[in-house]
Amino acid sequence: MYYNAFNTSNSFVNKNAQISMNIGDSLHLKVINNDTITHGFDIKWTTGLSNTIASGDSIEITFSSQNIGSYIYYDPLNYPNNAYVGLSGIIAVGSNSNSYFWNIKDHQLTWNDSIANGNNVNWSNYYPDYFTINGQSNPNINLDTTARVTGFVGDTILIYMANTGQAEHSIHFHGYHCNILFSSYKPSHVGRSKDTFPVKIMESYVLMLIPDKPGEYPVHDHNLLSVTGGGLYPFGMFLTLLIQ
């Protein structure tokens, strides 16, 4: 499958760089375009940061936030194609070291190669068949220590979640409820306690989990198509929480 990503070195991995910063800090980023075509860089819900980067060129930006948040950085050129094939990740703003990150995506396998070849796709006919968290699906996602939540009863755990795909998802927790600390789509929902979180396209949450009991509990997309890979179950957006 054709895939791009923002990486921290010249070695390609299919997991976008996870950027974390404290509230009030200034983040200085240098973004280098190692591709053969022009790309862009922007951070959602900010102004004045959008840039175009020619092949072999680079840009530098400074970003800060005075509030907790899960910001999406992405390539806005030829949107949504470049972001869809992988160029979209999370900037987590907060002050909790016990934090986890879920960058959720969906793909229609044949479309990735079609976009790579410069062909047009009709997004009204989009029907994804592969689903990932941080570039992995079940069972491999449980090996990602930045995604798989582990902890103890009474811990304060933050989960930064962003939907950087092109389909809506509904992430459901078994065993626990989470409090909403940040919602890009519905800021009025901050403070609510829920076990299911609808995530619109290119929107995000920060969730706070304080486990009240030990156990291993699943988290998955309530749209069960997203718990498959190539039509096979159980793959896709499914992982477990492990609380002691």
Where are the regions that the model predicts?
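Long, repeat-rich segments with strong aromatic
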Residues: 150, 157-171
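N-terminal, post-signal-peptide metal-ligating segments of extracellular/periplasmic oxidoreductases
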Residues: 1-39, 45-48, 60, 93-94, ...
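Intrinsic, low-complexity N-terminal interaction/targeting segments
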Residues: 179-197
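Hydrophobic beta-strand segments within beta-rich accessory/binding domains
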Residues: 29-31, 75, 160, 171
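Extracellular/periplasmic metallocenter environments
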Residues: 36-40, 45-100, 108-110, 196-244
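Short acidic, flexible loop segments centered on an aromatic residue
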Residues: 42-47, 168-179
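Generic beta-strand/beta-sheet core signal
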Residues: 105, 162, 172-174, 222
